């Protein structure tokens, strides 16, 4: 994350919004590494969900880029309460939004919204691509997808899905990105 920021956002005001889990820890570590040389701020969401919304609104007002480190691929329940309000506030901010791992509120496996979710301009895939990035409706919330090399060996597993590239589908006519198999009556499985 820090290398990505150094390469792309050196002179920008950045706000890390960090949740209570591992994704939040990634944001806190990046903030700590950058805090001496970059214009960065942090807002943390504790497990008790005590939220100072005035502080968050002020931080958002005075930043250019928001890094969404609230929830990652481990999210397994619907977004509710203050977490929902925080995500809605970020989405309404008209600021550039970078999601770490996956936009908060999306399932990394199914691509489904878990209630509400972050509308990211960029998503930083941490180490490897998750299936949910390429499925609907997540595809519409991911923005530009950047794969970050974490310098760790990839897990040894045989994927049960494959990513098809443009070369594989040159002769298939393009369609609306939200189309599904029921809209046309036929499905082509590759």
Model-derived regions, located:
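A cross-family phosphate/adenosyl-ligand binding-site feature
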Residues: 2-82, 137-139
